[in-house]
Amino acid sequence: MTLNPSTLNNGTLGDLKEHKDVVLSSNAQTDEKRFEEPSLEVGGSLAKVENGLSTSISSSASNLEGQQAPFFTKQNSCLSRFRELAQTYNIHEINLEEYVSQIKEVKQSLYSDDSVFNESKSSSPPDAHTDKYFTPCGSPTKLIHSTLLEERDTPSSLEHVSFYLQESAVSEVRFDKPSNNGPLGRSSLNLSSLSHELQTSQDSPSLSATNQLSSSDTLEPLQYPPSSFGSQRQFNASQDSPKRSPSKGSWSSILRRPSLTYSPKRQSTGLHRRSLTNYFKFPHRNAHQHNAIAHNPSVFGKPIGDLTSDPTNLCKFTFPTPECAPPSLLLPHIFAQCVHFLSLNALHVPGIFRISGSGPVIKAITEYFYSPPHFWLDETSEIFKRIGFPSYIDIAAVLKRYIMLLPGGLFTHKDILNLLVPLYVDSSRVKVPIDIRNEMAALCFSQIDSYVRFSILCSLLALLHQIATRTQELENGMENTKDSTLMKPEALGIIFGPLLLGNSSTDLSKSCPSGNVNDLMRFETEKARVEAKIVEGLIIHWPEVLLKINSLDIPNCFSDVGLTDQVAIFTPAVPKEDSPEQIPENVNASEESYPNVKHISKLPLINDSSDNESGNQENDDAVANESTKVVVDNQQPQPKISTVSDTAVPSMSFANNISSRSVISAATDSKPSTRTSPPFVNNTKPIVAKSPVTVTASSETNKKSQKINKKASPRVSLWTKLFGKFRSNKKKS
């Protein structure tokens, strides 16, 4: 169908629209007829592909389930055995959150006996605070409830803290108790709107009421008190307020201070003085830091997830002391290198795993470490030459960083940690025998997700047990162990206790029953204490736990245990350090090893003509050669030896030259037994010594010549110039 221009000119706009609709409908019908049969064919092929994929996936899944079925059944049998033992010995399953929340802390205040807070004992504080004191922003003292209940209150949830810490020291904002919707209040808090309200409320207090939060929010409207310097009653109870204590800069404040050591702080103006380092601190750098590190390919040479999943990054590792770990472990290369090196060399190092190593060295190891044969041998040799070779502390820091960045930590999930809680708390130690507790701990290890993680945990506990044993041996030989910095099981438990779960998303602090900041801090402290106690118990009783692991055949509970026969065997690598050339200790001072010795052939000549010196030049040369050999043998071997010229050394005077000659002759005569004749020397004429009379005469002449030189010296001190005439007149009188 075509359009006629005459009809287009004579027609209307409605006719044109109708014609357009007809053309589009006809084109659509032709397209449907054209692609009708191919679409059916494509649809049939897609359906066939989908059916094939589904059947292949289902078959592979069934095969995988069939292969992993025996491992799952063994894990379930270990778990059922654990519950049977718990029921037999009346061990109740205690959750870590429940156990920590039930602990009653003894709350003490530093100002409990102060007379200022006697009034607060009668008044009842709000429900969110049980310490009977409030701590406002910018003041370190405790303020009583009776005077500041209407003006100030501490935040009652974590959501309030972010805004509470950003406010200035002058503006005082009150956070009321949250509603019953939840302990943490709102899920999100708009800090920008609240900061805008804080800025506009001081100029127009009436506008603050209109800009309050809606009724759906859990927070009640904020109340802004008057200025900090407006009312005296507001700071009546504060010990650091300018109303009670004078200013620090005035002279009269020294006399009016209650004590010499009292120095009150000035009231903050609310203005933060910026420094140069503030402009280089960006908040987006630290956002999601642990997640970015876990997926960063520059950490440990490869992504840390690939180090535990890729078989090319794993090796079959045997612990240096086989009785401390299972026979064959499956470890990443870098972890195996660190464990092997520390187990052989660093058991006695004080503060190991506690002291942080060198940052550049640790970064070089974590960034440039690859699978063999490259690690520490090729790529990083030039780097270590510039920044220094790793020490024991650096390698221990690399091992600790690996565990910190490992997703899920050592246990993967908190259910395994909850199984170990009733075994190492104080109330259950009396009830459960040691043998049963070790067996139950070994059964808990069977619930780990992979054999690689199980190998990491076993090798780490074996290393920590070796360090604790070596520490005990060294401290037994010490008289005073109070100042010892060696690592005991308690210290190692404090370090590795929080690393049981790592930086996993299932953090136990999120399940705190209360949103109060003080309660959360106590919760985290108690949680770390329980975790440290668990690690400490595992370190102390690790040999017994290992016996139970081997007897129960725990390694066969993991489906990836077969990879130990497919990966490469561990080969230890040592940093390639270019040590300087060392000269052997027992080296004969010959002319071949020391070519410069031939220049030290003669002593300085003496201009003394006597009857005994004729024909003795050969003997003097022989004595000189023998003396130089003895001196060289007694000294440390050095690559370079200074030479002495053959020319005669000019003497200061003839008397001094004679005295030196006499001293040499006296030394030879005084100890004739110690002096041995040099071998392989043709002694035709014996050496004749000087007489004792000559020695005394030469010494007397030497003294006289020294006195003459002193008297004839032109040096005159300033004292003699000023007071010499006075002293001479005094002698004459």
Swiss-Prot record:
InterPro entries: Rho_GTPase_activation_prot, RhoGAP_dom. Residues 312-546 form the Rho-GAP domain. Residues 116-135, 174-256, 692-713 are annotated as: Disordered. Pfam families: RhoGAP. SMART domains: RhoGAP (SM00324). Keywords: GTPase activation, Phosphoprotein. GO terms for cellular component: cell division site; cytoplasm; lateral cell cortex; non-growing cell tip. It comes from the Eukaryota. Gene3D superfamilies: Rho GTPase activation protein. GO terms for molecular function: GTPase activator activity; small GTPase binding. Residues 179-195 have a biased composition (Low complexity). The record marks 354 as: Arginine finger. Residues 704-713 have a biased composition (Basic residues). The keyword rRNA processing does not apply. GO terms for biological process: regulation of establishment or maintenance of cell polarity; small GTPase-mediated signal transduction. Residues 116-125, 196-218, 225-240 have a biased composition (Polar residues). PROSITE patterns: RHOGAP (PS50238). The modification Phosphothreonine is found at residue 141. This is Probable Rho-GTPase-activating protein 6. It comes from Schizosaccharomyces pombe (strain 972 / ATCC 24843) (Fission yeast).
